[in-house]
C-alpha cells in the first residue's frame, strides 16, 4: 500500500507559539509518499540510502514501525520513501514521513486506525525521536488544511506562496537562542511575542493579499528583533522588497526557508507552494 502526507508551512507565530501565543499553519501541496509491502524482513529505501531497521539512518521510520508494531504483529516489511519536501528545511518533512509510514502500515497490515489515532501515534513518535514536540506538524500532516493554533480553528488561506530554501538549520539551537534572550530581557521579548500573537490572530481572518503582505513584513521585523534571522536572509529579503515583494522566515530561522505572497512572477531560486486541504491519504 502507498500512503502520502503533506508538508507544512508556518505562516505566522513561530517561536511565540512555544510561549503560549497563537500561530497560523497550513499544509502545503508537497507530499511524502511511503510504500509498504509485507515481507519476511525489514528493508527501508529512501534518499538517505537502503537499510534494515537502522535508527541512525531512518529514525522516524524505524520508530513509527516500532510504535505500530505495538498494535499489530509485523514480521517484516519493505518500506520505500519518496518525498517532495526538502529535508531539514522547516517544511514538515519529518512529520510527513511519520504520518505516511503509519498510514501505509495501517493499510497494508489491515489496521483499524482512523486519522485521530494516526495523529496521536505520529505525535508520540515525534516525541520519541526529538524528546519534545508541540504536535502541530503531525496534526497538519494528518488532517491537512490551514489552522489557527492552539485552538485548532480552521482558517481560509486562498493564497499561493513563493518559498526560498537556505538549507538545513538546527531548530533546537534557534529555540535555545530565543530562550536565552528572553531570560535576559523577559519583559521586552514577551511584548514582542504579544505583537506576534496579534499578527497571527489578524492573519487568521485576513481578507486581502495586501493586508497579508503587511503582516508578513511586520512579523519578519519582529523575528529579526529576537535574533533568528541572519545576514544572508536579510540580504535576500531586502532584494525582494526592492522588487515589491515582502517575505519572512518560516519555522525556526537561522537558515531553513523564507516565504512571501506569490503574485505571478517567481523570484529567482524559489519554488511555489499552495495550501493543501487534504491531509494523509491512501494512494493505492
From Swiss-Prot:
What pathway does this protein act in?
Isoprenoid biosynthesis; isopentenyl diphosphate biosynthesis via mevalonate pathway; isopentenyl diphosphate from (R)-mevalonate: step 1/3
Alphabetical UniProt keywords:
ATP-binding, Cytoplasm, Isoprene biosynthesis, Kinase, Lipid biosynthesis, Lipid metabolism, Magnesium, Nucleotide-binding, Transferase
Q: What is its EC number?
A: 2.7.1.36
Q: Name one GO molecular function term.
A: mevalonate kinase activity
Location of the active site: 137
Q: Name one GO biological process term.
A: isopentenyl diphosphate biosynthetic process, mevalonate pathway
Tell me its cofactors: Mg(2+)
Give the residues the record marks as binding ATP.
86-96
User: Cross-referenced SUPFAM superfamilies, in alphabetical order?
Assistant: GHMP Kinase, C-terminal domain, Ribosomal protein S5 domain 2-like
GO cellular component, alphabetical, reads: cytosol
**Which reaction(s) does the protein catalyse, per the Swiss-Prot or TrEMBL entry?**
(R)-mevalonate + ATP = (R)-5-phosphomevalonate + ADP + H(+)
| Pfam families given in the database record | GHMP_kinases_C, GHMP_kinases_N
Compartment list: Cytoplasm
Q: What class of enzyme is it?
A: transferase
Q: How does it associate, per the subunit comment?
A: Homodimer.
Q: Which PANTHER family match?
A: MEVALONATE KINASE
State the family it belongs to: Belongs to the GHMP kinase family. Mevalonate kinase subfamily.
Purpose: Catalyzes the phosphorylation of (R)-mevalonate (MVA) to (R)-mevalonate 5-phosphate (MVAP). Functions in the mevalonate (MVA) pathway leading to isopentenyl diphosphate (IPP), a key precursor for the biosynthesis of isoprenoid compounds such as archaeal membrane lipids.
Q: What is this protein called?
A: Mevalonate kinase
Amino acid at each position: 500500500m502507498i500512503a502520502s502526507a503533506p508538508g507544512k508551512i508556518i505562516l505566522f507565530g513561530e517561536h511565540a507559539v512555544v510561549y503560549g501565543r497563537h500561530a497560523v499553519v497550513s499544509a502545503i501541496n508537497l507530499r511524502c509518499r511511503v510504500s509498504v509491502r509485507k515481507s519476511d524482513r525489514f528493508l527501508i529505501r529512501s534518499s538517505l540510502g537502503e537499510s534494515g531497521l537502522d535508527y541512525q539512518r531512518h529514525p522516524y521510520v524505524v520508530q513509527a514501525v516500532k510504535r505500530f508494531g505495538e498494535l499489530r504483529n509485523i514480521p517484516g516489511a519493505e518500506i520505500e520513501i519518496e518525498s517532495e519536501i526538502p529535508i531539514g528545511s522547516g517544511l514538515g518533512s519529518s512529520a510527513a514521513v511519520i504520518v505516511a509510514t503509519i498510514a501505509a502500515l495501517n493499510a497494508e497490515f489491515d489496521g483499524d486506525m482512523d486519522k485521530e489515532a494516526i495523529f496521536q501515534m505520529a505525535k508520540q513518535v515525534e516525541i520519541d525521536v526529538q524528546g519534545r514536540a508541540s504536535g502541530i506538524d503531525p496534526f497538519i500532516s494528518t488532517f491537512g488544511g490551514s489552522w489557527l493554533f492552539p485552538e485548532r480553528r480552521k482558517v481560509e488561506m486562498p493564497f499561493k506562496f513563493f518559498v526560498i530554501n537556505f538549507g538545513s538549520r538546527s531548530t533546537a539551537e534557534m529555540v535555545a537562542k530565543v530562550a536565552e534572550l528572553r531570560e535576559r530581557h523577559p519583559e521586552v521579548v514577551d511584548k514582542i511575542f504579544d505583537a506576534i500573537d496579534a499578527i497571527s490572530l489578524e492573519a487568521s481572518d485576513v481578507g486581502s493579499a495586501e493586508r497579508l503582505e503587511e503582516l508578513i513584513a511586520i512579523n519578519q521585523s519582529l523575528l529579526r528583533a529576537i535574533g533568528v534571522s541572519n545576514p544572508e536572509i536579510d540580504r535576500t529579503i531586502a532584494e525582494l522588497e526592492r522588487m515589491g515583494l515582502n517575505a519572512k522566515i518560516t519555522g525556526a530561522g537561522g537558515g531553513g526557508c523564507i516565504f512571501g505572497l506569490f503574485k505571478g512572477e517567481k523570484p529567482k531560486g524559489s519554488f511555489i507552494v499552495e495550501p493543501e486541504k487534504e491531509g494523509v491519504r491512501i494512494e493505492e
